[in-house]
């Protein structure tokens, strides 16, 4: 994996990265490069980047995939590097998580592409750090640093859980979410449209024995709605362990923890077996950029995980060029709905001739 522009900016300044270092949500394999010169740990919330570091040989005893950092993994870091997340709430969460892990006088490094909103993050750094300032900038990226000069509050994971009641498609659900999870704290418009359309669909009458996959589960709203509607056990998949934790919390809040199987996966890599139904409001961004490769890879692989005559339901912004990709993957598709800027597509695993 080539280093992206943000990591290249860190390379320009790595003479300052010495001692014991933690990377929070690295976006490429730069932690491995730096580990040849320093004592480096990496905390990932994305299965994709976790797998990338494993593949290149990063020490697995210093590499962690989790929604929160456990103290037994390490503390007293000299430097902690955070890659600017798209969601500002997730940056707040990461800062609250890692500040207690930083030794007094230690340094936080925040690096991000200008499009990520990093320019507006200085105030967030100043809330817990001193001597905050711009260290460097290049290739439309910025690097800020700040020092820990004051005591910090212990991190309490439960303080970051958002819980609310949501009415959707004939059901009242208790939903839980965490910073950075898709649709955090609210009902996504596309999901609302999808569930209302599925509520009218013939297959929803009797599928308690069906295998159903929710791809890109977010806070678990689709998975929970499907379980309540059908009685089926749902497999919920996401690349983000924050999303998987939110889904776990959502099912627990509705007293149906045993009704879901959670899978952390880059695309469908970790999926075994076949499903009668796959339902998805798929991601179409890599960072801040539209990225068709995520959906294209998913559509091309999903046919390997559909039963004979198995069905796929997709909701998407109607400007996304999904129809030709669906046709290439499944041979054909049907558009079930188009309005309000969204479309719902239906595909089926072709019967063998």
UniProtKB/Swiss-Prot annotation:
EC number in record: 2.1.1.172
CDD domains: AdoMet_MTases
Subcellular location: Cytoplasm
Superkingdom field: Bacteria
Stated family: Belongs to the methyltransferase superfamily. RsmC family.
Function, in words: Specifically methylates the guanine in position 1207 of 16S rRNA in the 30S particle.
Known partners and oligomeric status: Monomer.
HAMAP family: 16SrRNA_methyltr_C
Designated name of the protein: Ribosomal RNA small subunit methyltransferase C
Species: Marinomonas sp. (strain MWYL1)
Lineage: Bacteria, Pseudomonadati, Pseudomonadota, Gammaproteobacteria, Oceanospirillales
Chain's gene name: rsmC
């Amino acid at each position: 994996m080539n280093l992206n522009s943000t990591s290249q900016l860190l390379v320009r300044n790595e003479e300052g990265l010495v001692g014991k270092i933690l990377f929070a949500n690295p976006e490429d394999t730069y932690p491995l490069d730096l580990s040849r010169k320093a004592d480096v740990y990496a905390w990932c919330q994305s299965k994709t980047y976790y797998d990338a570091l494993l593949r290149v040989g990063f020490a697995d005893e210093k590499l962690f995939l989790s929604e929160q950092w456990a103290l037994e993994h390490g503390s007293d870091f000299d430097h902690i590097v955070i890659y600017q997340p798209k969601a500002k709430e997730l940056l707040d969460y990461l800062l609250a998580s890692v500040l207690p892990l930083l030794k007094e006088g230690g340094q936080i490094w925040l690096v991000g592409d200008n499009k990520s909103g990093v320019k507006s993050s200085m105030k967030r750094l100043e809330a817990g750090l001193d001597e905050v300032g711009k260290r460097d900038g290049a290739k439309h990226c910025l690097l800020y640093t700040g020092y820990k000069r004051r005591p910090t509050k212990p991190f309490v994971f439960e303080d970051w859980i958002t819980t609310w009641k949501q009415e959707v498609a004939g059901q009242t659900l208790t939903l839980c979410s965490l910073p950075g999870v898709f649709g955090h704290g609210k009902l996504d418009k596309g999901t609302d449209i999808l569930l209302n359309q599925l509520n009218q669909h013939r297959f929803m009458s009797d599928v308690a024995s069906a295998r159903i996959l929710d791809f890109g589960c977010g806070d678990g709203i689709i998975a929970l709605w499907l379980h309540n509607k059908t009685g089926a056990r749902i497999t919920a998949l996401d690349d983000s362990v924050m999303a998987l934790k939110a889904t776990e919390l959502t099912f627990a809040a509705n007293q149906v923890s045993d009704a879901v199987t959670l899978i952390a996966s880059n695309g469908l890599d970790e999926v075994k077996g076949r499903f009668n139904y796959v339902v998805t409001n798929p991601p179409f961004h890599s960072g801040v950029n539209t990225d068709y490769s995520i959906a294209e890879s998913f559509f091309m692989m999903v046919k390997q995980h559909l039963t004979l005559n198995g069905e796929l339901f997709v909701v998407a912004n109607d400007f996304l060029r999904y129809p030709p990709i669906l046709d290439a993957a499944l041979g054909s598709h049907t558009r079930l709905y188009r309005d309000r800027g969204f479309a719902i597509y239906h595909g089926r695993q072709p019967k063998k001739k």
